[in-house]
Amino acid sequence: MRGNIAQLMQQAQKMQENLQRAQEELAKLEVTGTAGGGMVNVTLTGAKECRKVRIDPSILSDQEMAEDLIAAAFNDASNKIDAESKDRMGSATAGMQLPPGMKLPF
């Protein structure tokens, strides 16, 4: 029984280190979302902070379309970050047996 507890503690420590590393990598990540065939680009960090917005001047005359494309580009970047986060967090916990129903990050 002691061996099992010690093994669980080692697994937990390794998982914590892996998660910390994955979170640090995500914080450095920059992802660009696009909309309108590249007419609007929004770049977000892994923490979903907006770094850059590029808008093709040709769409500025149609305010509603510009607003929709900006929102779509932001959502595209946000979805890419979510997918990358899920992938990296999954890799950080690969091979570790988690109790049923337990999801990460905690």
Curated annotation (Swiss-Prot):
Superkingdom as given in the UniProt entry: Bacteria
InterPro entries cross-referenced by the UniProt entry: YbaB-like_sf, YbaB/EbfC
Location of region: Disordered: 80-106
GO terms assigned for molecular function: DNA binding
GO cellular component terms, A-Z: bacterial nucleoid; cytosol
Predominant location: cytoplasm
Localisation per UniProt entry: Cytoplasm, Nucleoid
Keyword Flavoprotein attached: no
Keyword DNA-binding in record: yes
Transmembrane spans: none
Biased composition (Basic and acidic residues): 80-89
Keywords of the record: Cytoplasm, DNA-binding
Protein family membership: Belongs to the YbaB/EbfC family.
Function of the molecule: Binds to DNA and alters its conformation. May be involved in regulation of gene expression, nucleoid organization and DNA protection.
Oligomeric and partner information: Homodimer.
Protein name according to UniProt: Nucleoid-associated protein XOO1065
Source organism (scientific name): Xanthomonas oryzae pv. oryzae (strain KACC10331 / KXO85)
